[in-house]
């Protein structure tokens, strides 16, 4: 009986010591990720148009989506949301607060090294680029990444502020080559890039066209509208700043167009 009691006490002590060790060593814990996308600007665009309008833009992440993530200035590694629970001891840092950086879509191998020598990469517009950050105390159970859009989605609307489904073909003539800072996600149009024609997709085509952030000056011809085989230039009446995460809503009228109800276009 005494032997059993001693064994029980020894086992209890061992279990208690293990618990204390785990509490004292947060690096041994695993943690999970949650990832969300800031949709405020998209929501504002929808509210100005129609409460029932939905856009083919990335508005949330699903289990199985792959992002590229860097923790504590380390290289970017692919991470599958909802499928992996990394351990804190895999992060080589003594800091109590750890900063995470993430890109979506996943980065290619040639730019996954996080260093000043590979800080920038060239990109082509047209699709969405998202960047997220989070800070968490080492040993936390959850790390919540918040993503923002780094590009400018374009929404084609009709006179009633509904998705445009007419026969007009809209092409914008803007810079479509850019440079991204992989440390903070910021994208700028390449200063040496020449404008090129960019086909603007309708909402019904399943994916929005995304532009690169850039400044457009009043009086510039920024594209064309083709209706019934007739091509008309699109001319900007005021300066426009295309800013990341802020959609451009172009309403097509019979004789003119409007960008975001503020900047008129002439045709």
Task: Please report, for each region that a protein language model flagged, where it lies by residue.
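Sec-type signal peptide cleavage vicinity
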Residues: 4, 17-267
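Sec-dependent bacterial lipoprotein signal peptides
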Residues: 1-15
């Amino acid at each position: 009986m005494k032997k059993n009691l001693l064994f029980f006490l020894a086992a209890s002590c061992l279990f208690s010591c293990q618990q204390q060790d785990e509490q004292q060593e947060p690096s041994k814990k695993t943690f999970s990720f949650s990832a969300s996308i800031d949709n405020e600007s998209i929501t504002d665009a929808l509210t100005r148009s129609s409460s029932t309008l939905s856009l083919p833009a990335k508005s949330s992440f699903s289990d199985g989506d792959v992002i590229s993530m860097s923790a504590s200035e380390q290289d970017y590694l692919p991470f599958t949301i909802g499928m992996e629970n990394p351990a804190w001891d895999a992060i080589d840092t003594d800091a109590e607060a750890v900063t995470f950086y993430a890109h979506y879509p996943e980065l290619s191998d040639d730019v996954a090294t996080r260093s000043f020598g590979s800080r920038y990469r060239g990109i082509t517009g047209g699709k969405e680029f998202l960047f997220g950050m989070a800070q968490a105390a080492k040993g936390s159970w959850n790390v919540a990444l918040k993503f923002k859009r780094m590009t400018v989605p374009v929404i084609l609307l009709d006179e009633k502020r509904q998705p445009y489904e007419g026969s007009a073909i809209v092409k914008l003539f803007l810079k479509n080559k850019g440079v991204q800072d992989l440390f903070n996600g910021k994208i700028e149009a390449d200063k040496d890039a020449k404008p090129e024609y960019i086909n603007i997709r309708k909402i019904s085509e399943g994916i929005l066209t995304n532009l690169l952030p850039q400044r457009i000056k009043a009086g510039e011809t920024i594209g064309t509208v083709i209706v019934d085989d007739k091509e008309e230039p699109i001319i900007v009446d005021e300066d426009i700043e295309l800013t990341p995460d802020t959609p451009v809503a172009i309403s097509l009228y019979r004789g003119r167009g409007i960008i975001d109800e503020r900047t008129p276009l002439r045709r």
